[in-house]
Amino acid sequence: AVEKTNSSSSLGEVVDRILDKGVVVDLWVRVSLVGIELLALEARVVI
């Protein structure tokens, strides 16, 4: 079920709500300049 609210939520409230639903989010970001890899983004969601 998707919950919609009219009030704005902080990032902490959103993460708390997601964790209460039993969802695990793994997010990994890497940005390099001298090593040339400017952006790498990896995300995994486990329900």
Curated annotation (Swiss-Prot):
Q: Has UniProt tagged this entry with the keyword Transferase?
A: no
* Record's subcellular location: Gas vesicle shell
Q: What is its main location?
A: other
Q: Where is the signal peptide?
A: none
Q: Name one GO molecular function term.
A: structural molecule activity
Q: Entry's InterPro entries? A: Gas-vesicle_GvpA-like (IPR000638), GvpA (IPR050530), GvpA-like_CS (IPR018493)
Q: Which UniProt keywords apply?
A: Gas vesicle
This protein's GO cellular component annotations are:
gas vesicle; vesicle membrane
Disulfide bond residue pairs? none
Q: Which domain of life, per UniProt? A: Bacteria
What does the subunit comment say?
The gas vesicle shell is 2 nm thick and consists of a single layer of this protein. It forms helical ribs nearly perpendicular to the long axis of the vesicle.
Q: What does this protein do?
A: Gas vesicles are hollow, gas filled proteinaceous nanostructures found in some microorganisms. During planktonic growth they allow positioning of the organism at a favorable depth for light or nutrient acquisition. GvpA forms the protein shell.
Q: Which family does it belong to?
A: Belongs to the gas vesicle GvpA family.
Q: Any idea what this protein is called?
A: Gas vesicle protein A
Species:
Dactylococcopsis salina (Myxobaktron salinum)
Output the lineage of the source organism: Bacteria, Bacillati, Cyanobacteriota, Cyanophyceae, Synechococcales
Gene behind the chain = gvpA
